[in-house]
From Swiss-Prot:
PROSITE patterns: RAB
Residues engaged in binding GTP: 28-35, 76-80, 133-136
CDD domains per the UniProt record, alphabetical: RabL2
The protein's name: Rab-like protein 2A
This protein's encoding gene: Rabl2
Segments of skewed composition (Polar residues): 210-223
The UniProt record lists the keyword Nucleotide-binding: yes
Family statement drawn from the similarity comment of this UniProt entry: Belongs to the small GTPase superfamily. Rab family.
Cross-referenced NCBIfam families: small_GTP
Pfam family, one: Ras
Length: 223
C-alpha cells in the first residue's frame, strides 16, 4: 500500500512537471463568500487542503485553456483576513487575484482599498478581478455603480455563490487571465533565463569533462 501511495505522489508530481501551473489568490473581508464561491465552482470535484503553516486553504483544479492542460492552485485566506492583512508568502508568485466584497455589507466594499493597496505592494502587475457577491439577496444591486472598479480599471463581476450566477464565467476568466499573465510576465522571462543558465552550466560541465578525458588520453606514459 505504501508503494501505491508513493507511486500516486510521483504521478501527481509528474503532472505538475509536465503541465502549466498557475496560482490564483482570493482577497476580501471575512464572510464575503470567497470559500463558497470556490466550492460552487468546483462542486463535488474539489478536495480542499488545509495548510496550517501558511494559514490558508488550497483548492486544486485542472482546466483546459487553448488546448493546454492547466493545473490551477486557488489560495483562500482561511480566516487570516480577520487581521486585515495577509502574509507576504500568500502573494508570492501569484498570477491573478479575485477580490470579493458582499453587496449587502458596505464595510466590505469600503475595505477594498486596503486589500488592493496590499495586493499592489506585493504583486503590482497581476490581473485582478473585482467580485460583487450575494446578488441573489438583492438583484437591484447589479444596477448600482461601484466606482472602485472604474477607478482602478478592474473588471467587475456580479455573482452569487448561493445560486451560481456568473460563478463559472468568473473562474474561467480568472484562469485565462492568470495563464496570459504568466506567459507574458517577468515571471515567465525569469523561468526562461533560469533554463538558459542551467543549460549553460550543463554545457560547461560537459566541456570540462571532455577536456579532462582528452588530457588523460594525451598524457605520456611514465618511463
Amino acid at each position: 500500500m505504501a508503494g501505491d501511495r508513493n507511486r500516486h505522489c510521483e504521478l501527481e508530481q509528474e503532472k505538475y512537471d509536465t503541465h502549466e501551473n498557475v496560482k490564483i489568490i482570493c482577497l476580501g473581508d471575512s464572510a464575503v463568500g470567497k470559500s463558497k464561491l470556490m466550492e460552487r465552482f468546483l462542486m463535488d470535484g474539489f478536495q480542499p487542503q488545509q495548510l496550517s503553516t501558511y494559514a490558508l486553504t488550497l483548492y486544486k483544479h485542472t482546466a483546459t485553456v487553448d488546448g493546454k492542460t492547466i493545473l490551477v492552485d486557488f489560495w483562500d485566506t482561511a480566516g487570516q483576513e480577520r487581521f486585515q492583512s495577509m502574509h507576504a508568502s500568500y502573494y508570492h508568485k501569484a498570477h491573478a487575484c479575485i477580490m470579493v466584497f458582499d453587496v449587502q455589507r458596505k464595510i466590505t466594499y469600503k475595505n477594498l482599498g486596503t486589500w488592493y493597496a496590499e495586493l499592489r505592494e506585493f504583486r503590482p502587475e497581476i490581473p485582478c478581478i473585482l467580485v460583487a457577491n450575494k446578488i441573489d439577496a438583492d438583484i437591484q444591486m447589479t444596477q448600482k455603480n461601484f466606482s472602485f472598479a472604474k477607478k482602478f480599471s478592474l473588471p467587475l463581476y456580479f455573482v452569487s455563490a448561493a445560486d451560481g450566477t456568473n460563478v463559472v464565467k468568473l473562474f474561467n476568466d480568472a484562469i485565462r487571465l492568470a495563464v496570459a499573465y504568466k506567459e507574458s510576465s517577468q515571471d515567465f522571462m525569469d523561468e526562461v533565463l533560469q533554463e538558459l543558465e542551467n543549460f549553460k552550466l550543463e554545457q560547461k560541465e560537459e566541456d570540462t569533462s571532455g577536456q579532462e578525458q582528452s588530457d588523460t588520453t594525451k598524457s605520456p606514459s611514465p618511463s
